[in-house]
């Protein structure tokens, strides 16, 4: 990719091969592994076998400039659908068709017309809102883990999930997403937030 003529404009490296750049002002220096600007959320069930005609609904969350590249993600999913996914049976993987894409429950892309409708599929996430919520006072949080979760703490994996360890992980993720895909690391009082999480 480094010698490619399209390296400066191609979205592949910015989505899949994010360079580990050092930038004092953005907060990137402390980040060992840059986060990808997308999250694919699987369906909220335990279904592992899909028959012909079954629907597979999933969510795609894009961050930062990746939001401008929705058309490329749609195209990529269409290509994956024609190639197929899952275990090969008789030398073939299961093909699928991307039927539609929705944002805020509105159809913004349909296989029928093959066009992306003008839309505002973006929402602004604020790290400050998260911090202010913690400052408002003590409250109960019930957390249900749907998929396996492993968090590293003090250079080791810990089976116990204390709220302050979870808060550290959330703050680290927010910080790295803002540093790489937002407007730089948010001005949060990390130490105070973790202290509050221990209370």
What do the PLM-derived regions correspond to, one by one?
Residues 1-199:
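RNA-interacting cores
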């Amino acid at each position: 990719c480094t010698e490619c003529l399209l390296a400066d404009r191609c979205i592949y490296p910015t989505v899949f091969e994010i360079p580990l750049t050092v930038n004092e002002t953005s907060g990137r220096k402390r980040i060992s592994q840059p986060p990808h600007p997308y999250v694919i959320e699987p369906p909220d069930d335990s279904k592992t076998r899909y028959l012909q005609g079954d629907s597979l609904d999933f969510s795609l969350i894009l961050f930062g400039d990746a939001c401008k590249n929705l058309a490329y993600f749609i195209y990529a999913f269409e290509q994956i659908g024609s190639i197929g996914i899952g275990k090969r049976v008789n030398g073939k993987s299961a093909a699928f068709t991307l039927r539609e894409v929705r944002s805020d429950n509105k159809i913004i892309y349909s296989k029928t017309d093959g066009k992306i409708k003008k839309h505002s599929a973006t929402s602004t996430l604020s790290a400050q809102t998260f911090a202010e919520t913690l400052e408002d006072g003590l409250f109960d949080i019930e957390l249900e883990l749907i998929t396996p979760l492993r968090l590293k703490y003090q250079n080791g994996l810990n089976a116990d999930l204390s709220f302050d360890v979870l808060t550290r992980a959330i703050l680290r993720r927010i910080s790295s997403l803002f540093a790489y895909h937002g407007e730089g690391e948010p001005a949060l009082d990390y130490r105070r937030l973790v202290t509050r999480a221990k209370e």
